[in-house]
């Protein structure tokens, strides 16, 4: 059986620091099933930038087929009207909503919540539907990447193939100044 699904859903998530990844994955999968939302429709996961280093969110992306994980600043999330704001979250991180606001902001203008915030022991989850398929989920910020490249013994023509492209695309360089100043 061939199932073709629109990728028009964004899962917004918030969780405690060091949350149990297996529990987060299980709860999100259960919430999607209960709402009748097929996981293949998920274009990506969105959260607040404070969670960029949260392993449970990365595990959730992997469990949902390797969907992208994107982040929004707390002030951007605070500007989004949501049906279930939390004063506790506002006091902690500066926005009254993480899961609902991140889902809506990630799904783009005209998005609607198809699953309002669901609270569970270690966090919250919400799902927004975009008004159109999200062919590439590029809203917000991606997690940073670290790339290790060899600069060789110094001469430009001795560098490994692709090294210059990585260096040109880098926001920050860390290395021995004799090489990085070239």
Q: Residues of each region from the PLM?
A:
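General beta-strand structural signal in soluble alpha/beta enzymes
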Residues: 69-73, 112-117, 175-176
């Amino acid at each position: 059986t061939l199932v073709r699904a629109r990728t028009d859903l964004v899962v917004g998530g918030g969780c405690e620091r060091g949350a149990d990844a297996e529990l987060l994955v299980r709860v999100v999968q259960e919430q999607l099933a209960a709402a009748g939302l097929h996981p293949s429709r998920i274009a990506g996961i969105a959260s607040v930038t404070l969670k960029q280093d949260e392993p449970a969110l990365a595990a959730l992306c992997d469990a949902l087929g390797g969907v992208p994980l994107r982040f929004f600043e707390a002030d951007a999330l605070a500007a989004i009207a949501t049906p279930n704001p939390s004063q506790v979250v506002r006091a902690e991180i500066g926005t009254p909503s993480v899961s609902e606001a991140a889902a809506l902001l990630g799904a783009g203008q005209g998005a609607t919540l198809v699953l309002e915030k669901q609270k569970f022991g270690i966090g919250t989850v919400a799902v927004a539907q975009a008004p159109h398929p999200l062919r590439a989920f590029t809203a917000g910020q991606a997690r940073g990447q670290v790339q290790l490249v060899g600069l060789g013994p110094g001469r430009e023509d001795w560098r490994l193939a692709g090294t210059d492209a990585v260096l040109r695309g880098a926001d920050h360089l860390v290395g021995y100044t004799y090489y990085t100043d070239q």
